């Protein structure tokens, strides 16, 4: 592979990785502790991840249990969960917070699939933008006579193959997540 392409391929990989991270946060009817990854609570004036101030476990398929290390954090954690877009209502017994995931309705599943497809499309746009930037950089090199026209054409073909590979991977990740959501 041409060294001039590597930074652009890295950017495409980052776009794909970002999509995969976003998909982790989309719940598919099962309890997944990673849904809490982006939530922050105020811990002595410092925004902290829930996993950093509590023990998070999944005792049942549709229940996340959060056991804060300090009882005073229960209210903070509940506030963060309610303020998030998870659509969950926390319940607590004074020591432990439980998040019960209701069964997803057919309508909600379809909405989630639409969201999954939208995020995938945004990632494809990002990958194509990286391709455009790469092609522009190669054209500048050719214009400055740093590479020949043949090299330019070869590199552009290589960039297109890499772009196609990432677009295919985005489609595969999207299909897998859509199937996961639609599986009852």
From Swiss-Prot:
GO CC entries: cytoplasm
GO biological process, alphabetically ordered: translational termination
Presence of the UniProt keyword Protein biosynthesis in the record: yes
Main location (coarse class): cytoplasm
Keywords, in A-Z order: Cytoplasm, Protein biosynthesis
GO molecular function ontology, one term from the record: ribosomal large subunit binding
Subcellular location(s) of the protein: Cytoplasm
Function: Responsible for the release of ribosomes from messenger RNA at the termination of protein biosynthesis. May increase the efficiency of translation by recycling ribosomes from one round of translation to another.
The family this protein is said to belong to: Belongs to the RRF family.
NCBIfam families linked: frr
Protein name per the record: Ribosome-recycling factor
Encoding gene (name): frr
């Amino acid at each position: 592979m041409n060294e001039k392409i590597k930074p652009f391929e890295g950017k495409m990989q980052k776009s794909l990785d970002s999509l995969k991270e976003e998909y982790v946060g989309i719940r598919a009817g099962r309890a997944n502790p990673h849904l809490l990854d982006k939530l922050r609570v105020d811990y002595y004036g410092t925004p902290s991840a829930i996993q950093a101030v509590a023990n998070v476990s999944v005792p049942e398929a549709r229940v996340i249990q959060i056991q804060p290390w300090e009882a005073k954090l229960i209210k903070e954690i509940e506030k963060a969960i309610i303020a998030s877009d998870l659509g969950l209502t926390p319940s607590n017994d004074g020591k432990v917070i439980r998040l019960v995931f209701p069964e997803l309705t057919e309508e909600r599943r379809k909405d989630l699939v639409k969201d999954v497809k939208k995020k995938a499309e945004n990632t494809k746009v990002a990958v194509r933008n990286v391709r455009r930037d790469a092609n522009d950089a190669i054209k500048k090199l050719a214009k400055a006579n740093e590479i020949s026209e043949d090299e330019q054409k070869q590199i552009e073909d290589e960039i297109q193959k890499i772009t196609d590979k990432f677009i295919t991977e985005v489609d595969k990740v999207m299909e897998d997540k859509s199937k996961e959501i639609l599986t009852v």
